[in-house]
Design a protein with these regions (language model features):
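A domain-start/cap signature at the N-terminus of enzymes
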Residues: 15-55, 103-104, 129-131, 136, ...
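Active-site machinery of serine-nucleophile hydrolases
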Residues: 55, 59-116
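Short alpha-helix in the alpha/beta-hydrolase fold that links the catalytic acid
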Residues: 70-72, 184-194
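Short, proline-enriched alpha-helix->beta-strand connector loops that line the catalytic pocket
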Residues: 85, 167-172, 198-200
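Short beta-strand/loop motif that positions the catalytic acidic residue
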Residues: 173-176, 180
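Histidine-bearing beta->alpha loop at or near hydrolase active sites
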Residues: 177, 207-214
Length: 235
């Protein structure tokens, strides 16, 4: 497994010339009623919230973690790709071993309830985006909470134990590289094709020559994914 420093180096070389998102992301923390705390980044849209805004939940990958990993992932990968949405962005640090853990699910849902109560969120446009472990979280959250999320973009991720009837019930854009040696390409493609055959609103984009840790190389595909989901929302 690569160290975090090597991952950051790979990412930096890939995104150094990429445009940045105009909004500011603040590092915050929420203490829950049971005393546990969850760190998160929050970005509010340019121009205020006089009209309802989309909300994007950004889920960072696993591996060696650093404080405020959620904010780092949002700033360097997600925000530049979703800039056209002018969305509210919520980027938590995973409070458990995996995003699909019950504790992580419960804590993130409480965080989203707070954000949605305090800000003008368009409930018809709530997107979850994640990479690797975070992509698994995108599959998990979208299948467990179809009443909340209306779009999902899992990148370089595998599906967990979610039953197939719960997957891709909303616009879902899957991105995976054939050169991924950490999360195999084959099962991801097979799963997406099965869901296509079931008539689910899913799109699968295959990338070439991108190692698993080259997150920055996924940004152009993420931009296309956001555009595709946005078009589905308009239908």
């Amino acid at each position: 497994m690569r160290t975090l420093s090597s991952v950051l180096l790979l990412l930096a070389t890939a995104v150094v010339a990429a445009p940045t998102h105009g909004a500011t992301l603040r590092d915050l923390s929420l203490t829950l009623p049971d005393g546990r705390a969850i760190a998160y980044g929050l970005s509010l849209p340019d121009g205020g919230e006089t009209t309802p805004r989309p909300l994007v939940l950004a889920l960072h990958p696993g591996g060696e973690r650093m404080p405020r990993y959620g904010s780092w992932f949002a700033r360097n990968i997600v925000m530049q790709a979703i800039a056209p949405l002018n969305a509210i962005v919520v980027a938590p640090d995973c409070p458990a071993q995996r995003w699909s853990d019950a504790d992580a699910d419960a804590m993130v849902m409480q965080l989203l309830q707070k954000v949605m109560a305090e800000h003008n969120v368009d409930r018809r446009r709530v997107l979850v985006v994640g990479f690797s472990m975070g992509g698994g979280g995108a599959w998990s959250f979208s299948s467990q909470h179809p009443d909340l999320f209306t779009g999902a973009i899992p990148m370089a991720a595998m599906v967990g134990s979610e039953p197939v009837e719960k997957l891709a019930t909303m616009p879902t854009y899957v991105i995976h590289s054939r050169a991924d040696s950490v999360v195999p390409f084959g099962p991801a493609e097979t799963n997406a094709r099965k869901l296509e055959q079931l008539g689910r609103p899913i799109r699968f984009e295959a990338l070439d020559d991108l190692p698993h840790f080259s997150m920055g190389g996924y940004v152009p595909s993420l931009q296309r994914a956001v555009q595709w989901v946005t078009e589905r929302w308009k239908q």
